[in-house]
Swiss-Prot record:
Catalytic activity: a 2'-deoxyribonucleoside 5'-phosphate + H2O = a 2'-deoxyribonucleoside + phosphate
Keywords, sorted A to Z: Cytoplasm, Hydrolase, Metal-binding, Nucleotide-binding
Cofactor(s) for this UniProt protein: a divalent metal cation
EC number: 3.1.3.89
Name this protein carries in UniProt: 5'-deoxynucleotidase ESA_00928
MF terms in GO: 5'-deoxynucleotidase activity; metal ion binding; nucleotide binding
């Protein structure tokens, strides 16, 4: 039985910091970001099904979100202003991501590749799945901005403004619900969110 470096590579996602050009009060790595995106994507899928007559698989969407940035273990986290500087760079970076995704899939033992390929390669996502993961990704970036701003770090003001436009473009009923029900708490301190339910 041959060895696979797949999970050894994925474990290094925690070494890749997000927002590399920004001063951060608290650094965020790709591994923890992926977990938060998975939780939010799962919630969006549940909300879509329960409140807005959706028919998506929340558990699959959580898994897709968990792996959505896995290729960054090979490419690094390219800053957004660089990634989207122009359409040519954006196109080439997408091609690089695709190569990285295929390289990761090739690391998986052949008898398991049919399970992992649809998680790592977004071309296997349905439109609903892709939309929910992208919404969750943008929401989590927005939440990071709120956390930094609430800690007094104005470095994230423009990023917050840019992400508000992104969220408006990716708007959905389930996102509106999430924004109204869950996001306001991110403006509060620990004392404020725990005062109604002390341990």
């Amino acid at each position: 039985m041959s060895q696979s470096h797949f999970f050894a590579y994925l474990s290094r996602l925690k070494l890749i910091n997000r927002w590399p050009l920004m001063r951060n009060v608290r650094t965020e790595n790709v591994s923890e970001h992926s977990l938060q995106v998975a939780m939010v994507a799962h919630a969006l899928a549940v909300i879509k099904n329960r409140k807005f007559q959706g028919n998506v698989n929340p558990e699959r969407i959580a898994l897709l979100a968990m792996y959505h940035d896995a290729s960054e273990v090979l490419t690094g986290d390219l800053p957004t202003p660089v990634k989207y500087f122009n359409s040519q760079i954006a196109h080439e970076y997408k091609a690089i991501e695709k190569i990285a995704q295929q390289k990761l899939i090739a690391m998986v033992p052949e008898e398991l590749q049919d399970i992992f390929a649809p998680l790592l390669d977004e071309h296997h996502y349905t439109e609903d799945e892709k939309s929910l993961v992208k919404q969750a990704d943008a929401l989590c970036a927005y939440l990071k901005c709120l956390e930094e701003l609430s800690a007094g770090n104005n470095e994230f003001l423009l990023a917050k403004s840019r992400l508000e436009k992104t969220l408006a473009q990716r708007h959905s009923a389930e996102m509106d619900y999430f924004m109204q029900v869950f996001v306001p708490s991110f403006h509060l301190s620990l004392d404020e969110i725990s005062q109604d339910s002390p341990l």
